[in-house]
């Protein structure tokens, strides 16, 4: 598992939820 990729995914999800 790639934690970095997971972070990006979480960040993208959070950005989507914010907007």
From Swiss-Prot:
- Reply yes or no: does the keyword Secreted apply: yes
Q: What is its main location?
A: secreted
**GO terms, molecular function:** toxin activity
Q: In which tissues is it expressed?
A: Expressed by the venom gland.
Task: Give the keywords, sorted.
Answer: Secreted, Toxin
Q: Is Secreted one of the keywords?
A: yes
Cystine connections? none
- Report the GO terms under cellular component: extracellular region
Family classification: Belongs to the cationic peptide 04 (cupiennin) family. 06 subfamily.
- Protein name per its UniProtKB record: Short cationic peptide-6b
Q: What is the lineage of its organism?
A: Eukaryota, Metazoa, Ecdysozoa, Arthropoda, Chelicerata
């Amino acid at each position: 598992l790639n934690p970095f990729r997971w972070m990006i995914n979480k960040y993208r999800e959070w950005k989507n939820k914010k907007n």
